[in-house]
Amino acid sequence: MLLEETLKSCPIVKRGKYHYFIHPISDGVPLVEPKLLREVATRIIKIGNFEGVNKIVTAEAMGIPLVTTLSLYTDIPYVIMRKREYKLPGEVPVFQSTGYSKGQLYLNGIEKGDKVIIIDDVISTGGTMIAIINALERAGAEIKDIICVIERGDGKKIVEEKTGYKIKTLVKIDVVDGEVVIL
């Protein structure tokens, strides 16, 4: 499958002690090919519970191409949790802490009773996902499913233990000796 092939050949960048994989799905570089987006969206649709879902939710930035593609395939609108405040009525601020940053995310466009599916590009520490879940619960949404394309590290397990939600992923990876390894 193209997702796994492109992960195995993607560049690795070391920052401090951490090795980052640079991939079109997680970083938008070097080039996001339409066939890769189609494959990922098709795989998400196959494993996802979209029944009754009226909104797809992601956090900026790299979830945006994924939810746009999914929205076009499913005709379900999407909502993006943003890193900046808009001060719109009903806006829900939530603190986000990841392995590389801390800050606020802001949720708009969700109403009590909305049935949502959360989509994200990568889950590694779980910080972003916990923030998304907290914001959606505060807004009164019903989370029907959670899917992350790439799983790395213990974030999936951490989120599942802290929130009680199960997270589906398309591929689990690690970086070993400067290369992505599919687990």
From Swiss-Prot:
The entry's keywords: Cytoplasm, Glycosyltransferase, Purine salvage, Transferase
> What are the EC numbers?
2.4.2.8
Protein localization: Cytoplasm
Molecular-function GO terms, alphabetical: guanine phosphoribosyltransferase activity; hypoxanthine phosphoribosyltransferase activity
- Cite a single Pfam family from the UniProt record: Pribosyltran
Q: Which domain of life is it from?
A: Archaea
What is the enzyme's class at the highest EC level?
Answer: transferase
One GO-annotated biological process of the protein: IMP salvage
> Where mainly found?
cytoplasm
Catalytic activity as recorded in UniProt: IMP + diphosphate = hypoxanthine + 5-phospho-alpha-D-ribose 1-diphosphate; GMP + diphosphate = guanine + 5-phospho-alpha-D-ribose 1-diphosphate
The pathway to which it is assigned is: Purine metabolism; IMP biosynthesis via salvage pathway; IMP from hypoxanthine: step 1/1
UniProt-listed PROSITE patterns? PUR_PYR_PR_TRANSFER
Q: Which cysteines are joined by disulfide bonds?
A: none
Q: What GO CC annotations are associated with the protein?
A: cytoplasm
Q: How does it assemble?
A: Homodimer.
Biological role: Catalyzes a salvage reaction resulting in the formation of IMP that is energically less costly than de novo synthesis.
**What NCBIfam families does the annotation carry?**
HPT_Archaea, PRK02304.1-4
What family is reported? Belongs to the purine/pyrimidine phosphoribosyltransferase family. Archaeal HPRT subfamily.
Recorded hits in PANTHER family, A to Z, give: HYPOXANTHINE/GUANINE PHOSPHORIBOSYLTRANSFERASE, XANTHINE PHOSPHORIBOSYLTRANSFERASE
Protein name in UniProt: Hypoxanthine/guanine phosphoribosyltransferase
Q: Which lineage is the organism of this entry classified under, starting from the top rank?
A: Archaea, Methanobacteriati, Methanobacteriota, Methanomada group, Methanococci
Q: Which gene encodes it?
A: hpt
